[in-house]
From Swiss-Prot:
This is Uncharacterized protein 055R. It comes from Frog virus 3 (isolate Goorha). Residues 249-261 have a biased composition (Basic and acidic residues). The lineage of its organism: Viruses, Varidnaviria, Bamfordvirae, Nucleocytoviricota, Megaviricetes. It comes from the Viruses. Residues 1-20, 227-290, 331-371 are annotated as: Disordered. Residues 7-20 have a biased composition (Low complexity).
Length: 379
């Protein structure tokens, strides 16, 4: 079992690791394949003679993923039938509440490669193919082999660690997906009978959240194209009456049927807007170099609050992608973000609603189990 604040970094790539790896960031972990076989099948872990090794592995020996059961992410084919990626080995962390970050192999953007991306996974989180399809719309394509695996313990801002590969060169774009996992207390309260419903359980399958939360998301700086365009069934609120679901055979008089024309998704009805302190919509700031980045950072800070420990064991919601060295935004990058809130109002005591530090007296929703925060950094 790893310590609570342990940090494990090892490179997995075709050739030798590029650049020196800091010794203080490596933790020697004994590889016990028999113990791993009891924990879960080593699916997809095959001998690869050219596999790069870390400081705590024997050269020439395949590096098994010893952190838990291995899942797969199958990606869609690329343009002209070219496959952009292969199944990515996604593992579950050892300790509870320990996020796992898997970074795909880095390629220059625009030269037939795929952009660098970061996927944040919590305990018992799986990445189905539908989530990979939605991430592909954001420009995130995972490759066959992960460039690095990074484990951080509780109390460490995951974004500070996750965006480090973006500092290698100007040709990288980073998409940070931070799912806020569910704690053990939340699982016990909700029970196993609700674990199959992704919109009510704490993010066990994030695809349900992304597909169902389009009309609930707080738009900050819009992402184009939208993540999902599947919000076709709408809930209609009749003044003074209840809420019903529109349908062909619906006989409920409280439900008002709309005209026959197809209503476009919310993401296509109007361009994404920001809101000022008074709640009035404002156009997204024009990002031009370093001066535009600072303005975008202030707007992002107001719109997406920094949520504290809203539930035991949950990750904090970062509002800006910053560098680990000085805490400043990444230079020369445009920051855009989109926050997905949960349609489940939650149970009392989970800290859903609080006061934003950037908006005095205005109540905003803080992240909790089931929330997903997506931020994108582009050159």
């Amino acid at each position: 079992m790893l310590p609570q604040n342990s940090q494990v970094v090892h490179g997995v790539q075709d050739g030798p690791p590029v650049g020196p790896q800091p010794a203080q960031a490596l933790l020697k972990v004994p590889v016990d394949v028999r113990r791993q076989a009891q924990a879960g099948p080593l699916a997809g872990v095959e001998p690869r003679p050219r596999l790069g090794v870390g400081a705590h592995h024997t050269p020439g020996v395949p590096v098994p993923l010893i952190l838990g059961a291995v899942q797969h992410v199958h990606l869609l084919p690329g343009p002209r039938g070219q496959c952009l990626g292969h199944p990515l080995d996604v593992v579950h962390p050892l300790a509870q509440h320990q996020p796992l970050y898997v970074g795909p192999e880095e390629h220059p953007v625009g030269q037939g490669g795929v952009p660098l991306g970061v996927i944040g996974l919590g305990l018992d989180h799986r990445v189905p193919v539908h989530l990979a399809r939605d991430l592909a719309k954001l420009g995130l394509y995972v490759h066959a082999r992960a460039e690095y695996l990074h484990l951080v313990g509780p109390g460490v801002d995951p974004v500070h660690r996750a965006v480090l590969p973006a500092e290698k060169g100007p040709q990288c774009s980073v998409v940070v997906v931070v799912p806020h996992g569910c704690s053990a207390q939340t699982q016990q309260v909700r029970g196993p009978h609700r674990q199959e419903d992704p919109t009510r359980h704490g993010g066990r399958q994030l695809v349900g959240l992304i597909h169902n939360q389009e009309k609930f998301c707080g738009r900050v700086l819009g992402l184009d194209p939208p993540v999902s365009q599947r919000s076709r069934t709408r809930h209609i609120q009749v003044p003074g009456q209840g809420v019903g679901r529109r349908g062909a055979g619906c006989k409920d008089p409280r439900v008002r049927k709309e005209p026959g024309r197809r209503v476009p998704p919310l993401s296509r009805q109007h361009p994404p807007v920001c809101q000022d302190e008074g709640g009035q919509p404002q156009p997204p700031p024009q990002l031009q170099g370093h001066e535009g980045l600072a303005e975008a950072g202030r707007a992002l800070e107001h719109a997406v609050p920094l949520g504290g420990d809203v539930a035991p064991g949950l990750l904090q919601d970062p509002f800006l992608v910053r560098s680990e060295r000085d805490g400043a935004p990444l230079p020369g990058c445009a920051v855009s973000g989109r926050r997905f809130a949960s349609q489940d109002p939650g149970t009392p005591g989970e800290g859903d609603v609080g006061l934003s530090p950037g908006r005095e007296g205005k109540q905003v929703r803080f992240p909790r189990a089931g929330h997903v925060s997506i931020y994108r950094v582009e050159p």
